[in-house]
Amino acid sequence: MCIRDRAGGVIEAAVEAMRAKVPDCKLKAWLGPRIGFDDFEVGSEVAEVFRTKYPDVAGGIKAKDAKYCVDLAAYAKAALNKVGVEDIEDCGLSTFADAERFYSYRRDGEQTGRHAAVIWIEQ
């Protein structure tokens, strides 16, 4: 999922689509590996998108040199909370910082691989 998708509301839209199909569903979210807060550097325009979309997130952006670092986990949690998902677990792993286990386009450039996710329904 790209950063503009996350800021653009794809998390909220996905939850709303699930609830449209199963209105009484109890959702649990798991935040998987992603680029860590200290390593996700963006320009002011991207930082401002997050500030505007989620003004209640405290500490989700910090200045670093001439750039800004964005805490993707904090904003994903805010997006989930916005649509009523409160049961959220976060693995806390950074794809950028953990080169032994994860690919990172930002770290490795063109030498990339793939990540996978599992989603299921329990009845």
Which residues make up each language-model segment?
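Active-site microenvironment for binding and transforming phosphate-containing groups
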Residues: 3-123
